[in-house]
Amino acid sequence: MKLIAIDLDGTLLNSKHQVSLENENALRQAQRDGIEVVVSTGRAHFDVMSIFEPLGIKTWVISANGAVIHDPEGRLYHHETIDKKRAYDILSWLESENYYYEVFTGSAIYTPQNGRELLDVELDRFRSANPEADLSVLKQAAEVQYSQSGFAYINSFQELFEADEPIDFYNILGFSFFKEKLEAGWKRYEHAEDLTLVSSAEHNFELSSRKASKGQALKRLAKQLNIPLEETAAVGDSLNDKSMLEAAGKGVAMGNAREDIKSIADAVTLTNDEHGVAHMMKHLL
């Protein structure tokens, strides 16, 4: 195996959003063995750097669900953007329907100033409708969103279209605790010919250019590095990893992955709290 593409949340990162020592050592060993380690995530590149710079590990990074590729030195290699008019229409709808949203750009993740309030209101509504429900899981899902670095806060999405410098729209995320709101997002965009629609967690949906996906980015990078796809592996847990697992020579699902991801994988490793990435590198490749 000459290249391994690795998802972050639910895969390389454990439930505490950390890279375990076992996984860290596995990455270093792979690099010593001459394997090209690639981080492939829905997160923004600068957010990935906040995790990897303290570790002193440099890799190629596929970010924003495949919309952006940076080389190990942090230089932009390739990007695919959402058409600005399309981005305006998407954000106008999300804001009018009171979604918590995130806009991934090259410089920041833009989110509403009242974003936490929007989710707090949803939590209160959810609690009222489901008094017996355990809200800790929902609160943890919200904390995953808040734990990212590089946030910039806006009063309205329209500020992004009034900026002095034009903004590249890489990825737009909608988030809700309510199934019907998530389904409304899927229904609205699932047949859009110019967009890729995926999800990286139970409570979100994410939109990027039709030319952007983790699978397409993996193919592009493998070609750039002159590595046959048969000599690549990919590991992930969520719907946004599906194209990557299908594109790679060997697709590996995490033990904590969705069942539909496990069903298309060539192998299943341990969970992200059991150092599943390290286990994969040692036993499954």
UniProtKB/Swiss-Prot annotation:
Active site: D7
Names of the cofactor(s): Mg(2+)
The protein's Enzyme Commission number: 3.1.3.-
Annotated positions binding Mg(2+): D7, D9, D237, S238
UniProt GO molecular function: magnesium ion binding; phosphatase activity
Broadest EC class assigned to this enzyme: hydrolase
Pfam family, one: Hydrolase_3
Keywords associated with the record: Hydrolase, Magnesium, Metal-binding
Listed transmembrane segments: none
Binding site for phosphate: L8, T41, G42, K214, N240, K282, H283
Tagged with keyword Magnesium: yes
An annotated GO cellular component: cytosol
Family: Belongs to the HAD-like hydrolase superfamily. Cof family.
Function recorded in the entry: Catalyzes the dephosphorylation of phosphorylated 5-6 carbon sugars and monophosphate nucleotides (NMP) in vitro. To a lesser extent, dephosphorylates flavin mononucleotide (FMN) in vitro.
Protein name as annotated: Phosphatase YwpJ
Species this chain originates from: Bacillus subtilis (strain 168)
